Each structure stands twice: as structure tokens, then as C-alpha cells.
């Protein structure tokens, strides 16, 4: 009996890790180092912390799980999740925990497998989109380069714009009487 409980806990742990690894908000935080130089280690620790949280609290409500995950992401990764994924991930974790409590290893395996497959599809799509975006940016860069080397009256400017010279030096100076006590400057029309 202890072996079955150990197997179910290992399956629950794998499911928690799969759900967290497939969570885009967490992955963005990890990839961009929002948790500091140890973001990868914090993400692994997060899986264990979530598992322990469920093991210590048998009757968790969905909002309690959301609050716990939100607090961990805020404290450890300086990330506030506002994309609507927090309730989804919380629901997945809670469903997995219910399967764990019933000892339904097959359902745990199926959920973890489904989450992993979905993550692979999203990753493949994201890579394809990123490559297309890079190609589009190359096109924009070349257009911008052409604009920078445009000529002005037959002479190349190389992206440097000549500064206009003031026409009347007296018009550019600010008179002391135009400065008000609050630090504001009164602007008057040219005569």
C-alpha cells in the first residue's frame, strides 16, 4: 500500500512540474531572469513548494491556490499575473490533487501527458512565430537604413540633421522679468 501511495505522490509531483513548466507566465519570468540569477532554481523549488502546500492542506479552495501561486510569483519572480492563466493553472493543480487523493494514477498520468503535449505545441508555434518576426524585423531595418542614408539637396546626411541656427540672438534670450516666482517662464509672441 505504501508503494502505491509513493507512486501516486511521484505522479502528482510530475503533474505539478508539468503544469508549472507549461505555464507561460512563469516561463517568461524564468527566461527573462525576473527571479534574479537563480530563476531556474527558483522555478524547480516552486514545484516542490506547491506540492508541499497541497500535502499540508487537504481541503484547499480554488481561490486559496490562486492566492498562494500569485504570492509566490510576486515574491520570488517580481511578477504579477494578469493574463487570466492563474485560475487555469490553479484549477489544473487542484484537479490533479483530487486525483492524487483518490489514488487515480491513470488520471494523473493522462493530465500530465496532456499538459506536456499542449506545451510542446505552443512551443513549436512560438518558435515559428519568432522566426517570422525576425524576418519581418530584418525588412524593417533595411527600410530604416535606406531612410537614414537619404540625400538632402544632393549631399548625403548620413543620418545627421543640421541644427537650425537662431535668426535673432536677442529673441532666444529669456528676460528676467519673464520668470515668475514659481519657476514658470512667460512665453511672449514675437513682435
Curated annotation (Swiss-Prot):
Alphabetical UniProt keywords: Diamond-Blackfan anemia, Disease variant, rRNA processing
Q: Which InterPro entries match?
A: Pre-rRNA_process_TSR2
Q: Which disease is it linked to?
A: Diamond-Blackfan anemia 14, with mandibulofacial dysostosis: A form of Diamond-Blackfan anemia, a congenital non-regenerative hypoplastic anemia that usually presents early in infancy. Diamond-Blackfan anemia is characterized by a moderate to severe macrocytic anemia, erythroblastopenia, and an increased risk of malignancy. 30 to 40% of Diamond-Blackfan anemia patients present with short stature and congenital anomalies, the most frequent being craniofacial (Pierre-Robin syndrome and cleft palate), thumb and urogenital anomalies.
PANTHER family associated with the record? PRE-RRNA-PROCESSING PROTEIN TSR2 HOMOLOG
Give yes or no: UniProt keyword rRNA processing: yes
Biological processes annotated in GO: maturation of SSU-rRNA from tricistronic rRNA transcript (SSU-rRNA, 5.8S rRNA, LSU-rRNA)
The record's comment on protein family reads:
Belongs to the TSR2 family.
Signal sequence coordinates: none
Task: From the Swiss-Prot or TrEMBL record, give the protein name.
Answer: Pre-rRNA-processing protein TSR2 homolog
Q: Which gene encodes it?
A: TSR2
Q: Check the record and name the Pfam families matching this protein.
A: WGG (PF10273)
Amino acid at each position: 500500500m505504501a508503494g502505491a501511495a509513493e507512486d501516486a505522490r511521484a505522479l502528482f509531483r510530475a503533474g505539478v512540474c508539468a503544469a508549472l513548466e507549461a505555464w507561460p507566465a512563469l516561463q517568461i519570468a524564468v527566461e527573462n531572469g525576473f527571479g534574479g540569477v537563480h530563476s531556474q532554481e527558483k522555478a524547480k523549488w516552486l514545484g516542490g513548494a506547491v506540492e508541499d502546500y497541497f500535502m499540508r492542506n487537504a481541503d484547499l479552495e480554488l481561490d486559496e491556490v490562486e492566492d498562494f501561486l500569485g504570492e509566490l510569483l510576486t515574491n520570488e519572480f517580481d511578477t504579477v499575473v494578469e493574463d487570466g492563466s492563474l485560475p487555469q493553472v490553479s484549477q489544473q493543480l487542484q484537479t490533479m490533487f483530487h486525483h492524487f487523493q483518490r489514488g487515480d494514477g491513470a488520471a494523473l498520468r493522462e493530465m500530465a501527458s496532456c499538459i506536456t503535449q499542449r506545451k510542446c505545441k505552443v512551443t513549436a508555434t512560438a518558435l515559428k512565430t519568432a522566426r517570422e518576426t525576425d524576418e519581418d524585423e530584418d525588412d524593417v531595418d533595411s527600410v530604416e537604413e535606406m531612410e537614414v542614408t537619404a540625400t538632402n539637396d544632393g549631399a548625403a546626411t548620413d543620418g545627421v540633421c543640421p541644427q537650425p541656427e537662431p535668426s535673432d540672438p536677442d529673441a532666444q534670450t529669456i528676460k528676467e522679468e519673464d520668470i515668475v516666482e514659481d519657476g514658470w517662464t512667460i512665453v511672449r509672441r514675437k513682435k
